[in-house]
Amino acid sequence: MDLAGPDQVFFEGIEYGADLCIEYVTIGKSIITSAGLHIGIMKHFSEIKLTKGDFIIIPGTQLSYFQSIAYKSNTSLHQWIRNAYELKVHICSICSGAFALAHIGILKNKMCTTHWKRTGLLQELYPDIEVIENVLYTEDSGIYTSAGVASGIDLALHILEQLYGKYFAHKVARELVIYKRRSGHHKQQSDLLEFRNH
């Protein structure tokens, strides 16, 4: 969902006339998601030439991956993201993707968020970033982070609104049968989901 949710928002935006191009990239030829879904042949990230105003979206995965030697030693990917950010490419993370951005250093002295179960750990591991708890998404200096899963959809709609206006984002949300648009300031935990014994 961290990948598919925002992807569907942008796809529907294209269907409504947004001038967007979606590219899927990875460090290899294919990926297996944390849920076990195999995603076939994809471009290597280095094949993509980015320009100012583009977006890179890093979906979440098992936190252990972002803490693994395999990820941490992939310096060419890290440098590609850093270079993109210097070119004024917007960098977005969904859920645990914030750990990837923190590791490569582009969240330093910036606000960010992640899934409520991991905000404390993110702040502990990276004390030079400002982790905002209990918000759906943040935006700071061209870097967007979100709490994950459903909030990735909220973030994608926010980006569409910035690019194409409120009414355009409303049309896309309606097409996606979104019950209610949520801003980044909404809480991660819904009061409607509180456990009750009646």
Language model regions located:
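Extended, subdomain-level signal for the structured scaffold at the beginning of enzyme domains
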Residues: 1-91, 99-103, 133, 157, ...
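A conserved active-site-flanking secondary-structure segment within enzyme catalytic domains
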Residues: 107-135
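Short active-site oxyanion
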Residues: 86-91, 106-111, 142
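Amphipathic alpha-helical segments enriched in hydrophobic/aromatic residues interleaved with Lys/Arg
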Residues: 125-157, 163
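Flexible, glycine/proline-enriched loop segments at strand-loop-helix junctions
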Residues: 67-69, 108-110, 143-146, 159
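Short alpha-helical
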Residues: 1, 99, 117-120, 151
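Short, glycine-/aromatic-enriched active-site segment of Class I SAM-dependent methyltransferases
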Residues: 176
